[in-house]
Amino acid sequence: MKQILLLISFFISLTIHAQTGKLSHSFIENFSDSVLENFRYGSTGTKAAFKWQSGVTSKTEPGSKVLLFKIDPMDSAGAGRGPEIISNNFTYFGTYTARLKVPDVRTVQPNTGAVIGYFTYFMDSVYGLSEIDFEWLVADPSIIYIGTWTGNRGQLKRIGRTINLDSGIIYNTIYKEGYKGEPFPLTGAQNQPETIEAIDNYDASSKFYTYGFDWYPDRLTWWIIHPVTGKKIVLWDYQGSQRGIPQHQSYYRMNFWHTNEWGLENNPNAIEKPLHPYELEVDWMSYDPFK
């Protein structure tokens, strides 16, 4: 009887643990004011005030107010050390959308090692990691990295796809275990679409683009809005297995940080410490939970 009571107590504690976070309502953060409404700032790196501002005039679109991130050359390498915003409350199954422009570093420092992350992230002590991401390495803004991380610490699992959207080339669609695990190609329903319509002259640093993902319990879809036609172009429609699809709530985020390990597909030398405070502009971010 004592063992049964202990088991019941354990499962109740798991349920309580899973329900402790407050879930966000539907929102759009326009970054039109210096004060954030649905996010908080959270960098673990230097405390330099210049690293972020909200409600500043865009240098790309003078009529727009934006969130401005500047990478600090004094920051050490590592995710979270650069500027980052984190949603005040948890987010869950729903549609996530953002409009942003990454910096162009190619004429100044072509081997810059810096990452833009548009993503969800929460490491739960019981259920492990819940991460869905879009990422760009600023040394080549024609390439998009999308995917998820799930699993407990030391047992992380990745599903991912790497795309050159200017040419429409899909470099890989894979599953791997751990950061340095062997990648295994995904096929069938986990590898759709098998071809992608190129966006002529796609360059994430040349203008603002709108990106998004739809997070379902059994499906994940990443997409971009074509800047001319307004058509939604699906970058990856992952289904056919629940493996790799986060099942617990997360925090909604945007960040900009230095990497000294992750080089480009076509340039592994692009891991240099940023020499200047390169700028990321974010026009808006939205979240619409499924009913």
Q: For each of these PLM feature ranges, what is it?
A:
Residues 19-291:
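GH16 jelly-roll
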Residues 4-14:
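Sec-dependent N-terminal signal peptides
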